[in-house]
């Protein structure tokens, strides 16, 4: 007998504004509990030190979390110049202290080095795995392991200000970019060392900054619902963004009702007007109900790749 899943069927994306000092998984579990969701997943961890946008996918939205993981990100970062730490942030131990002896022109020249397409060697204090273990576990044991440089793109690197020994930058970058590594490398280029003291993720993909909510706000809504003897979902669910916003950049293909049943059974259906090998967002019928993503093949057929479970059908079956 199949084990019954706990929690309710609720699909959507919460733009959580993660607070500092907590892990991304801790934040995820709190959101899942507030919404009483049957399943949840985040779209790229933030370090405990970091704050800001952490999209949390609930229910069927978890099927599309990888697309947000692969998306561009934007960060506001403040670095302390003159001190290098073993973790490249303020959670680590200071390993070197040097005076600030660079000019403004040298700073601007150094910043230019990081713009565009570059190669980055990930920090030992990262979640990347080597022989099945996260790098940070080796680092904590004092073990250095080989890491290959990876291609990254910094689309924008904007100088915000320099006050004393604190430098603030705005960075728009590709997936897999380690801001701590940029700051550490910048400090070495300037000859003084540097580490991150504040890191805030301000954007993931196209999601708006003003749609973020904190755990405290969610907790307050749950408390309000209890006081007014309401179901918490009546106050919380309006905060959810539609799950297809995770793949909003994909072109839409609307499948007519006549072909919908075939598609939902995993069969390819014929559509026209799109190039082969194109990933698309699939909607059904006149209601344009989002049901997943698919790919156009060489024969002009739309092959489903990732379909959602329609809960009204699930209950009926």
Curated annotation (Swiss-Prot):
Belongs to the pseudouridine synthase TruB family. Type 1 subfamily. Its EC number is 5.4.99.25. PANTHER family: PSEUDOURIDYLATE SYNTHASE TRUB1, TRNA-PSEUDOURIDINE SYNTHASE. Keywords: Isomerase, tRNA processing. InterPro entries: PsdUridine_synth_cat_dom_sf, PsdUridine_synth_N, PUA-like_sf, PUA_sf, tRNA_psdUridine_synth_TruB, tRNA_sdUridine_synth_fam1_C, TruB_C. It catalyses: uridine(55) in tRNA = pseudouridine(55) in tRNA. This is tRNA pseudouridine synthase B. The active site is at 47 (nucleophile). GO terms for molecular function: RNA binding; tRNA pseudouridine(55) synthase activity.
